[in-house]
Each structure stands twice: as C-alpha cells, then as structure tokens.
Amino acid sequence: MRMERIEKMTKKKKKALKDLWYVVIALILLGGGYFTSNLDKSSKNEETANKNNELLVYFIDVGQADSIYIKDGNSNMLIDAGNNTDGSLLVKYLKSLGVNEFKYAVGTHAHEDHIGGMDDIIKNFTIDNYLMPKKISTSKTFEDVLDALNEKRVSPNIPKTGDKFTLDKASFEVLSVGISDDDTDLNDTSVVLKMTYDKTCTLFMGDASSAVENNLLNKDIQCQVLKVGHHGSRYSSSDEFIKTVKPSYGIIMVGKDNKYGHPTNKTLDVLNKYNVTVHRTDQEGTIIMKIKGDNISFENIKTNTNG
C-alpha cells in the first residue's frame, strides 16, 4: 500500500513539474523578447575558429522533409530534423560526422516534416540554443519536442524579425517569423534565415509561401544560394521573388516520387527562367555545399538517411 502511494505521489509530482514547464513555455511564447538576451550564448565546448576558412552545409536527404546541418569551424547548427521516423537515423548520421553539440538548433515551424525528429536530436545532443516560432501546434509531434526540451531543461528562444546571431564566422539574420500574429498557416510562420559567410550568402526559407516572399522583396535578399521554400511547391518561389534574390543555386529538399508532385513544373520553370542551377535531394541524395571565400562547390552522397 505504501509503495502504491509513493508511485501515485511520484506520478503527481512528475505531472506537476510537466505542467509547470508548459506554463514557463507559455510565458516565453506570450512575452517574446527572450531571444535577443539569451542568444549567442557560447557553446560549452567551443574551441578555435575555422582554421580552413571553409563552411560546410549538409542538405540531408530525409525524403519529403527538411534537415540541414551547418558546420562552421568547431560550431554546429541544425535547421529542422525531418519526419518522426527520421529521428534515430539523423542521430546516427550526425554522430558519424563527429557531432556532439549544437550551438543552435532551429525548428523552423511546427509541422511534422520539419520537427518530427527534433525530440531525438534534443535528447541525444547538447543544445545551447533552441529556436522556434511563436506559433504553436496541438500535435503530438510538437508536444514531443516540448517534452524533450523539458527533459533536457532547454528553454526555447523565440526569435523576432531582425534578430542577428553568429555561429563561428558565419552570421545569421532572421528575415521573417510570420506575416502577422494572426497567421493560421504554420508554413508562413517559418523562421526564415539569411546566412552570410565571407562573400557568400544563403537563404533558408523553411516552408514560407509567396505571401512571406512578397514581404521580403524590399529587404537585402540577393543571395547566391537559395534553399527553395516548401519543397518546390507551387505556393512558393514566385517569379518576382526569384528575380529579386538572383540565386545562382537552388536546393530543393524533396522525396522521390512524392504524392504532392513536388517540385512542381511551375517552380522549376521559374528557376530555369532565371538560370538557377538546381540541386535536388530526391535525385542526388544528401547534398554537401562547401563555401570558401566566393567559391561555392557541391558534392552529393547517398546516405539513405530517410530509410
């Protein structure tokens, strides 16, 4: 009987702590402004700068999903973590690359094909800063991410448009976190990032639609590399946006023979119109981009990360 009471008390205590954690998360989401004061916290094991002056960006083949690993010297960053079924595979792959810690991990928005494996990432790596938009979801996938953050005692950072931070030599600017607080489409709440390294810049669009793209047209968005928004769907990559960005390269993260028909001919036609060289994970597997000075090179490997 005593053991039963202890177990009940333990369960109640765990539930109370979990409920308290969700209150803390809610206060952070409602309050905002947490990002700027806590960002750029140094990695616990951060060492010397990038001696090779070379940045590596892995567009990891996770099928119809996104996961991007950035290695800048001894500092690591992850943007998205694929679907729920990709988590353990991503952990294994990233560990094979020698990754143990992320200075930044970003869940661009609360859709399963972007944060599905993030709970596994949080549980298996040291996360110094976790970035996510203010807009939340009631999905089990999103709850799993919050539970993992709770378990590891990592408080999320809620970025605002215009926020800036650095990895090692690479600098980042938050270009968008949504059109308004009333956004109903989670895609449009994507954390859109501009990365600058030496003489090269890259745009990471998440799943942002043409509506978000239109809001960016008056900003400094001309970049050599574009991570094409929303897997190359017809809802992103408008003619005016591609014309303004003027990318030399477009990376499309997409699953082979996916049911959505991504990338669409509309998107491919626009990219072709502006002479954008396209790299696709469904055709090339994991794509590794190397940046050194103003030189950009690509190689691809069949990682089978998506099973």
Predicted regions mapped to residue ranges:
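Non-globular, low-confidence helical/coil segments that flank catalytic cores
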Residues: 2-307
